[in-house]
Regions:
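Intrinsically disordered, low-complexity regions enriched in acidic/Ser/Thr/Pro/Gln residues
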Residues: 2-7, 11, 151
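Extended low-complexity intrinsically disordered regions
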Residues: 9-52, 56
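Mobile acidic interaction elements
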Residues: 16, 20-24, 71-73, 77-81, ...
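Structured beta-strand/loop patches that form or line metal/cofactor-binding pockets in enzymes
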Residues: 49-72
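Short connector loops at helix/strand junctions that flank enzyme active sites
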Residues: 61-65, 75-77, 92-94
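A short glycine/serine-rich beta->alpha loop
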Residues: 79-88, 124-129
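Alpha-helical support elements that line or immediately flank enzyme active sites
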Residues: 94-104
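C-terminal binding/interaction regions
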Residues: 108-113, 117-151
């Protein structure tokens, strides 16, 4: 019997599958370096959010202060914007993975991403369970916003 966590690349959107595969191809210490690269790649907030931080939602499950906003554009493409302090590279890396991996997908494609995706990228031994839970919470919040139609 197949478990939920044994998903194949074809079940994931291409960007998320590529990100997962990039991590899994590396030895554990190098996975942390890749996570730091993602942290450095977290895009700046667009001015409409940077100038109005009250529009962002805090992800309280994260140990570091993470704020995010999910929107769906006129072409029905999802965009996830997040901000996290530079002193929290793990959290920034997770936010960046989701921002890059979900960007441009349809709402249904995002909703179809397995909830356990954060557990499948090969970091469960390298970072604390609390940190993985933070990434899981970011994904869950994104999905909740889309389900509520508030994105």
């Amino acid at each position: 019997m197949a478990e939920c966590s044994s998903m194949t690349a074809t079940e994931l959107p291409a960007k998320l599958a590529e990100i997962r595969d990039d991590f899994l191809e590396l030895e554990e210490p190098d996975r942390l370096l890749l996570l730091l690269e993602f942290a450095d790649e977290l895009p700046e907030l667009p001015p409409r959010y940077a100038e109005h931080p009250d529009l962002l939602e805090r992800v309280v499950e994260c140990q570091s202060p993470v704020f995010m906003f999910v929107e769906v554009d006129d072409d029905s493409a999802v965009h996830l914007y997040a901000t996290a302090p530079r002193e929290a590279p793990t959290t920034r890396g997770f936010a960046s993975i989701l921002s890059q991996g979900l960007d441009g997908l349809s709402a249904q494609e995002v909703l179809d991403v397995p909830d356990d995706y954060p557990n499948t990228i090969g970091l469960t031994k390298a970072v604390s369970p609390l940190r993985i839970r933070g990434m899981t919470a970011m994904l869950a919040r994104t999905k909740r916003r889309l389900r509520e139609g508030t994105a």
